[in-house]
Amino acid sequence: MTSVPPELIPVVVVGALGRMGAEVIKAVHLASDCELVGAVDTTPGKEGVEIGEELGIGVLDVALTSDIEACLCSVSQSFHRTGPGQGAVLVDFTHPSVVYEHTRAAFAYGVHPVIGTTGLSHQQLVDLSEFAAKASMGGAVIPNFSVGMVLLQQAAAAAARFYDNAELTELHHNRKADAPSGTCIKTAEMMEELGKSFNSPEVDEHESLTGSRGGLRASGLRLHSLRLPGLVAHQEVMFGAPGESYTLRHDTIDRSAYMPGVLLTVRKVRQLQGLVYGLERLI
């Protein structure tokens, strides 16, 4: 494995050939304080290809592998973590079905996980927090790396103090596997922190088509998910009151919007104690 000067942060990207993974590799390559040391992806027929050439950004001397365990083992040996501010960082943009095991493996090998994959359950997050504590390591699960989305979430939480009726809608590309999005769930959780109930029914509702009114949370908030080609990531929170409505909306039109948040997290995760959930905890 290529040696990395001590002032650089060694980074492994899992899901390297995906849309987000490829964008992260490009951002890491351009960052003056980071160095790509591993790339993992299970796309058939790509084992061993040079990842920089595959993505059209020049040779990076990093061969793509499908074996995350072998990659983590090699990285752990090359960049051994002996205390805070040390060790390698894993950035994961893969699939809800595998991200939990990837995160556990990262902690086991002493590699700090930065998880952008959504779909982790509450219990899985609790378990991962325990793994982080036992390993005395920092890690981060970030449902959305956009600073603009963090501002929307904070505005929605503030507005929830004054409005009793609200619904959330998230729109994504049709290759997103989980619904509702982790960002939408996180927004609802922030709105619910006051402990109030929303959307007291005015009539006895009847759905002629099951699911027409969206997913119902215990608080009364309803979450709606749309999946269409041509979309990237979009979210809207609409509040209603007699005589008015108040709408908050954020649109991501290109994945490059997430890269400042990704790099911010990569730079901070090695200094963290325990597992952090949400970009707002870091800015």
Swiss-Prot record:
GO terms for cellular component: cytosol. Pathway: Amino-acid biosynthesis; L-lysine biosynthesis via DAP pathway; (S)-tetrahydrodipicolinate from L-aspartate: step 4/4. It is found in: Cytoplasm. Its EC number is 1.17.1.8. NAD(+) binds at residues 15-20, 116-118. CDD domains: DHDPR_N (cd02274). It comes from the Bacteria. (S)-2,3,4,5-tetrahydrodipicolinate binds at residues 173, 182-183. The active site is at 172 (proton donor/acceptor), 176 (proton donor). InterPro entries: DapB_C, DapB_N, DapB_N_CS, DHDPR_bac, NAD(P)-bd_dom_sf. It is an enzyme of class 1 (oxidoreductase). GO terms for biological process: diaminopimelate biosynthetic process; lysine biosynthetic process via diaminopimelate. It holds the Pfam family DapB_C. Belongs to the DapB family. Catalyzes the conversion of 4-hydroxy-tetrahydrodipicolinate (HTPA) to tetrahydrodipicolinate. This is 4-hydroxy-tetrahydrodipicolinate reductase. It comes from Prochlorococcus marinus (strain MIT 9313). The gene is dapB.
